[in-house]
């Protein structure tokens, strides 16, 4: 029997799919190379934006004519699970994020829907079927307690549940034994880790991970700026394994919009935090997220965001146009929605600005020697692709063949907004 998994959305979803793949493989299933050859199709869904839901619905609908057994899981299961079961009789089961480890229990018998905020079986992540062995993602928690007004995650993934630290450390050890050199710790707001445990916090966990032999780089995504303390940053800066790249979701550069979003910080506080990170971590790169067109965003609000983006000089910015999510506070502000064409124009303007900023920042890398972790080889061009400690993508040539998981010194000879180019130094 063969299975195939479609995954939509964030890195946490990709990690969940690897966990489910591991469960299926350990029970005798074989992963199919394509959906046509499969007997079971698992669709891991995302509800952060409407577009992600529409893509998943399109996939579910298209599978009807193939006659496959279908299981739908992920965030969309929590908010549209009943609708999916009623609209699509070919769907065998719907599993919310807390129930994904129960995949084997729902493959036969009556159609089932398992949703709700239950205790997550984190132990199942230890048997994840990872696509990459050298760079792995490890889930340290589920859920969120912050309730930003635009965000559906607390409603789909529930409240914060911290994973047992010894379970996390053991998974990291197993990954290292299997070839991992880079570990990325995953959580909705990773610095909330440990709030439901005794004697643990996020930085304590990172400090323990750093003691494991073979861990060369540690990354994490993402901390909430409101809860990221200077003492945390100082402790992290003292760990040589922690990569000098910090992703801090800003969401808006206007204080009034931040207040309406329930982000719990001001632009001044955010700028102070970034300044402290830049002082504490040599050659650090900073990334962020922005939402454009939040309900009630005026031209003045937008211009404040534009100016703040200019001021902060982020290395990379992931932007999205606001998408109303059912059940969230912001979605009830229909009378103040920003017209789609206005939001798109603002998005384009910010993107053009950030392209210039990123291009300017990346020019500083030209002529430098960077330690690059190899991710893959481009079979078409014969070039290799990897990442610097600051998470810059590097495309380079090498006289000798190099493999994923190797660290190579690369001389950078060209830089664009999103990619560096170079040659291996050896």
Curated annotation (Swiss-Prot):
InterPro entries: Elp3/MiaA/NifB-like_rSAM, Methylthiotransferase, Methylthiotransferase_CS, Methylthiotransferase_N, Methylthiotransferase_N_sf, MiaB_methiolase, rSAM, rSAM_horseshoe. One of its GO terms (cellular component) is cytosol. Residues 130-360 form the Radical SAM core domain. [4Fe-4S] cluster 1 binds at residues 10, 46, 75. It catalyses: N(6)-dimethylallyladenosine(37) in tRNA + (sulfur carrier)-SH + AH2 + 2 S-adenosyl-L-methionine = 2-methylsulfanyl-N(6)-dimethylallyladenosine(37) in tRNA + (sulfur carrier)-H + 5'-deoxyadenosine + L-methionine + A + S-adenosyl-L-homocysteine + 2 H(+). Keywords: 4Fe-4S, Cytoplasm, Iron, Iron-sulfur, Metal-binding, S-adenosyl-L-methionine, Transferase, tRNA processing. Coiled coil: none annotated. Transmembrane segments: none annotated. [4Fe-4S] cluster 2 binds at residues 144, 148, 151. One of its GO terms (molecular function) is metal ion binding. Its cofactor is [4Fe-4S] cluster. It is found in: Cytoplasm. Its EC number is 2.8.4.3. Residues 363-426 form the TRAM domain. Binds 2 [4Fe-4S] clusters. One cluster is coordinated with 3 cysteines and an exchangeable S-adenosyl-L-methionine. Catalyzes the methylthiolation of N6-(dimethylallyl)adenosine (i(6)A), leading to the formation of 2-methylthio-N6-(dimethylallyl)adenosine (ms(2)i(6)A) at position 37 in tRNAs that read codons beginning with uridine. Belongs to the methylthiotransferase family. MiaB subfamily. This is tRNA-2-methylthio-N(6)-dimethylallyladenosine synthase. The gene is miaB.
